[in-house]
Amino acid sequence: MTVSKFVQIRRDLHRIPEIGFKEWKTQQYILDYIGTLSHEFVEVKTWKTGVIVKVNGKNPEKIIGYRADIDGLPITEETGYEFASIHEGMMHACGHDVHTTIGLGLLTKAVSERIDDDLVFLFQPAEEGPGGALPMLESEELKEWKPNIILGLHIAPEYAVGTIATKEGLLFANTSELYIDLKGKGGHAAYPHTANDMIVAASHLVTQLQSVISRNVNPLDSAVITIGKITGGTVQNIIAEKSRLEGTIRTLSVESMKRVKSRIESIVAGIEASFQCEAIIDYGAMYHQVYNHEELTREFMEFVHKQTDMNVITCTEAMTGEDFGYMLREIPGFMFWLGVNSEYGLHHAKLKPDEEVIEKAITFLSQYVKWKGNRK
C-alpha cells in the first residue's frame, strides 16, 4: 500500500527513536530532508542534537516560530507496526515523530508558498528530559532568530482526528522530578537492633508524603505527588542500608510548587531524625507551566473555527508537563492538543496515532501561518 510522503516520513522517524540529547540519527534525518528544500532564503543551524531552520520572508515585520520536540522514550514498543522501533527499549510513545513530521510538512509549505514574515522552525531535543527548550531558547544559535510569536502542539489520543483543543491562559502544569536517597546502616536480618532499615524508612516516607497534597494545598488548586519507583536492599536476609524513591510533582501554580517542595523537605528532615539516617533530595528536571497568551490563543481558535475544516473545542487545564512552557514564558504564543484517536494513551507501549492527522495538521497550520504572516 502506497502512503503519502509525510506519512512515510513519520514512519521513518518512528523507527529511530532516541532519548534526550542523543537524537543523532533523528537530527541527520531532519537535516537530510531540509537539504532537499534548499533555497537562498532558507538558513539552517544545528544546536546540540536539534535543528533550527529559518525561512526568510518576502517583507518581514516579525518572526513566527513553530516548535517540534524530536526525542523518544525508554519504552519497549508493543504496537505491532511493520515500521516499529529498531532501537531496542526505545519508542516514540509520546507522538514526537508526529510533531516533527508536521513541522517538516509546514516547513515544506513555507518554502513553496513563501509568506511576508520570517518563519523559524525549532526541532528541539530532550523534551522528555532533561529538558531542551530552555537551553535552546538561551542559545547563541537562536539569539538572532528568536521568534516574536511561537506555537506548538501535542497529540491527544482521546480526541478525534479533525479536532483540536486548547484554552486561553494556563494549559499545562508546573512539573518537577523527585528523587530521594536514604542511607542508614545495613545488617543481618536476624539482628535488626544492630542495623538501621532503609526500607522501613522509605515506607514511612511514602506514607507521610500522601499528606502533603491533602493537607497543604488548597483543594481548588490541584497538585499531585506520585512516587512511581522504589528501590532498596540486596537480598531477602540482609537489612537494607540504602533505599531510593523516584517520583514526580505537578502543580497548577508556582506558589503551590514552592509549598509542596517545602513540605517534602520538612518531612524528609523528620525521617532523618526518626530513623537516624541521611537523606538527599534531588528535584531533577523542572518544567515551567504552559501558559497560553490570551489574545493570540483566542485569535487562533476563532481562525480555526471560521476558516478551516477543523473542529476546535475549549478544554480544561491538565497536569501534563511540557518544557515548551519556558518558551511561552518569554515569547507570546500558545500550545494546543491535536486529536489522533488512539485507543492507548501517551507513554503507552501500544500508542498508535491515526496517521490521517498528519496531512490535516499540515494543511490547517499552513493556512493559519499564511493568514498570520502575510500583510493584509
Curated annotation (Swiss-Prot):
Keywords: Amino-acid biosynthesis, Diaminopimelate biosynthesis, Hydrolase, Lysine biosynthesis. The active site is at residues 69, 128. Pathway: Amino-acid biosynthesis; L-lysine biosynthesis via DAP pathway; LL-2,6-diaminopimelate from (S)-tetrahydrodipicolinate (acetylase route): step 3/3. GO terms for molecular function: N-acetyldiaminopimelate deacetylase activity. It catalyses: N-acetyl-(2S,6S)-2,6-diaminopimelate + H2O = (2S,6S)-2,6-diaminopimelate + acetate. GO terms for biological process: diaminopimelate biosynthetic process; lysine biosynthetic process via diaminopimelate. InterPro entries: AcetylDAP_deacetylase, Amidohydrolase, Bact_exopeptidase_dim_dom, Peptidase_M20, Peptidase_M20_dimer. Transmembrane segments: none annotated. The keyword ATP-binding does not apply. Coiled coil: none annotated. Its EC number is 3.5.1.47. Belongs to the peptidase M20A family. N-acetyldiaminopimelate deacetylase subfamily. Catalyzes the conversion of N-acetyl-diaminopimelate to diaminopimelate and acetate. This is N-acetyldiaminopimelate deacetylase.
